[in-house]
């Protein structure tokens, strides 16, 4: 689960940057 957190943060960051 801890290994999935950075991936989720990276995805959210990418979405925020795209907006």
Swiss-Prot record:
It is found in: Secreted. Disulfide bonds: none annotated. The modification Leucine amide is found at residue 19. The keyword Glycoprotein does not apply. Keywords: Amidation, Amphibian defense peptide, Antimicrobial, Secreted. GO terms for cellular component: extracellular region. The keyword Plastid does not apply. Expressed by the skin glands. One of its GO terms (biological process) is defense response. Has antimicrobial activity. Belongs to the frog skin active peptide (FSAP) family. Phylloseptin subfamily. This is Phylloseptin-J4. It comes from Phasmahyla jandaia (Jandaia leaf frog).
